[in-house]
A protein has these predicted regions:
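HotDog/MaoC-like acyl-thioester-processing domains
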Residues: 61-62, 71-126
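Hydrophobic beta-strand-centered segment that forms part of the acyl-chain substrate-binding groove
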Residues: 34-73, 79, 94, 106
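Hot-dog-fold acyl-thioester-processing enzymes
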Residues: 1-47, 108-110, 114-126
Length: 126
């Protein structure tokens, strides 16, 4: 099971030279997508326990459009291991406001994390 959120990256999110956005921006999107996945699976927002791994693979810039995917990797009694991927699907061409839809998405960030649901919210069906 998976959920995908898409979002425009405002230029105001860029804090570094080259119009770069910090990596925490993508991790916040992972949190939102992970919460959506947990609600879909268990009817509960869950609590995020932490990341086992995070890889920053390509820069995200102001003016990009990204999609954050949360995919269930495994399900325990109360724990949910989730694989995340942040992809850039549109890229700003220049500072004039022009942008293009990318022929192939650029994978910017990958991560794996664990969420936990309360006993009363845990379901047994996948």
């Amino acid at each position: 099971m998976k959920v995908v959120h898409q979002r425009y990256v405002a230029h105001s999110e860029a804090h570094y030279a080259g119009n770069l956005v910090d990596g925490a921006f993508g991790l916040k999107l992972f949190g939102d997508a992970g919460t959506h996945l947990a609600i879909t699976l268990d009817g509960h927002e869950s609590l995020f326990a932490g990341y086992a791994s995070v890889e920053f693979l390509a820069p995200v810039r102001g003016g990009d459009v990204v999609e954050a995917e949360a995919r269930l990797a495994s399900k325990g009694r109360r724990s949910r291991t989730v694989d995340f991927e942040l992809r850039i699907i549109c890229r700003s061409v220049d500072d004039s406001g022009r942008a293009e839809v990318l022929a192939e998405p650029i994978v910017a960030t990958r991560a794996r994390g664990t969420a936990v649901v309360p006993v009363e919210a845990a379901t047994t069906a996948l």
